[in-house]
């Protein structure tokens, strides 16, 4: 099992180093994994002039999974758009046809005070958002800005095919079947024909999953319900644009994006795994970044791409035990806790892995 490690930019190398320590621990226990580093984003631009160089493309194709730190930095803002670090991330997603984005939204009991919502509203929060990643209005054609009747007009095309909807629906139903058996599909079928088709295809697909309870919700109501009563949701499936917005909204229910992993999968469960936070150049090199989202992304990788459920669960339990022991990086620190840096947080997680 070959894993490409793409540390990226900003705090990426610091947080990746801690996730790599966790993976090497399992390697020493006998897990047959091979770890190979590569360049993506700004570091790749600096080294090769390209955000997604050919060597990284080959590595990504050959690897069974990819673990990413973060990409981006203000020093690259003056580059042509196609040379900016973020284009490397878009390119690797396209190259690998990663169409399913999975975002767990979990609030650890130890961090309940970090949420801006009342503890009784978010206690026990555990949602999985499944977002279609390669279609919808972000990629539909035609698109552009042009002159019509003497003025500029901007336009985009929201479009989905039956097959695109069906394949993401299967991912969501299967995920719900592994969890609590409830799936909510989010659309805007009352005004958008594209999402009427979405609802029709998801409803049809449900016939193959009799053990999963399907519900539908309009996106404006879903945005409201995520704040009003987020615990009503188990798995949520939606299109690219709605998922982009709702997953960011849901992530803030936990109080810290430094805790949240994500996965982007192809149709064979090969995936790109990464924390949802950015490269945080303002704290890069200070040794204070929270590595837990990257460590939890490694756990997702072991679960979804390698079917190593036991190892994944052990990592998650080690993270929770570390929080129970009151260790906190600066982003999740509160009075009375033990403030630690990036490396020491990694030390604590490893110690808890070893003391199972």
From Swiss-Prot:
UniProt keyword annotation of Transmembrane present: no
Residue positions binding substrate: 93, 103, 131, 220
Domain of life per record: Bacteria
Protein name: 3-isopropylmalate dehydrogenase
Family stated for the protein in its record: Belongs to the isocitrate and isopropylmalate dehydrogenases family. LeuB type 1 subfamily.
Biological source species: Nitrosomonas europaea (strain ATCC 19718 / CIP 103999 / KCTC 2705 / NBRC 14298)
Subcellular location: Cytoplasm
Enzyme Commission code(s) on record: 1.1.1.85
Biological or metabolic pathway of the protein: Amino-acid biosynthesis; L-leucine biosynthesis; L-leucine from 3-methyl-2-oxobutanoate: step 3/4
GO CC annotations, alphabetized: cytosol
GO MF annotation terms: 3-isopropylmalate dehydrogenase activity; magnesium ion binding; NAD binding
Biological-process GO terms, alphabetical: L-leucine biosynthetic process
Residues annotated to bind NAD(+): 73-86, 278-290
Assigned keywords, A-Z: Amino-acid biosynthesis, Branched-chain amino acid biosynthesis, Cytoplasm, Leucine biosynthesis, Magnesium, Manganese, Metal-binding, NAD, Oxidoreductase
Reaction catalyzed: (2R,3S)-3-isopropylmalate + NAD(+) = 4-methyl-2-oxopentanoate + CO2 + NADH
Residues at which Mg(2+) binds: 220, 244, 248
Cofactor note: Binds 1 Mg(2+) or Mn(2+) ion per subunit.
Cofactor: Mg(2+); Mn(2+)
HAMAP family for the chain: LeuB_type1
